[in-house]
Amino acid sequence: MKYTFTSLFLLLFLGAFSQVDLLDELSKDQKPKREYVAYTFKTTRVINGHSIETVKKNQLDFRVSHRFGDIAGSPNDHIHSFFGFDQAADIAIIFEYGITDDLTVGIGRMKGAGPLRELWNANLKYRVLKQTKDFKFPITITLFGNTTISSMRSSADITSVNYFPKGYTGFSHRLSYTLQALMAVKATDWLSVQLSPTFVWRNNVPYGDKNGMFFLGLSARAKFSKRIGMIFEYFLPVIKPRVGGREYFPMVRGIKNAAYYPNLHIGFEFETGGHVFHVNFTNSRGLLENDFLPYNTANWAQGQFRLGFTISRSFPLSFKDKPKEDRKYWKKGSVEDEK
């Protein structure tokens, strides 16, 4: 009996040991699940420029943007224009739809602030790579492109940028394009930084100017809470200092009243019940990359900056196949509560 009990004990011990050993082997074979960062930026825009964010699958993002006039651009003019509130530098209405979580298409209508007005825009955005939480892949990369056409009446002045002759040539003169490779890192839970190499092509430009221009954008977001953050943008042309009589770096060269100034934007974002609200100050009069990047003539140092706002809201077009946490968001909370 003693030997039987001893044998039984040894069998149970060896069986338990082999089971633990087998579980260890199985755990080694299972690869750890890769986790990606979420909400590097709150919405698909930082301020004027696009962020690496895309619209979620089967959701429609609707946004309205408004830029007022100069706060203090001319002596005493700020009194008569009530610090720019009586004026509208640009207005935009935009719809964007998420075909997948990584692919977004959009259309929009902008008033326009450059020589071409009444701008109709179509864009495509695809997120190629995502940043992982363990930083094994440290950045998110999104590709963006748009096509813009002006529907404004043709000028009678044949030397004007907005002179559109009849036929294909006139139609072509109305078009412009933007391409971007957006690269961002969510460095911490509260800080995100983005680089935006940008190429803008205009089919028709003022005499001596360049059709194609490169820009480099730097954007950042500092999150104070799940619903409040500070946002920043700066776009600088990658070009010779002087092209066709136009100075592209007037501040460095000590030139006043130049025909171009880099774009500097700063603002705050607030989220309330599913709406994301941006309040910002910019020296850009336009809202579209094709418009504000090549045509900005406003100088912060001369009071030529303006108050602006953007309000955006995403609507789920279908709750089918949506995870429960997404459904909870539409009832209450922040878009970042679920992460």
Predicted regions and their residues:
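A mid-sequence, solvent-exposed acidic-amphipathic segment
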Residues: 190, 195-241
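Transmembrane beta-barrel domains of Gram-negative outer membranes and organellar outer membranes
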Residues: 19-156, 160-168, 175-179, 185-191, ...
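N-terminal signal peptide c-region/cleavage motif recognized by signal peptidases
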Residues: 13-15
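Positively charged n-region of N-terminal signal peptides that target proteins for export
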Residues: 1-5
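Conserved N-terminal ligand/cofactor-binding loop architecture of enzyme catalytic domains
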Residues: 331
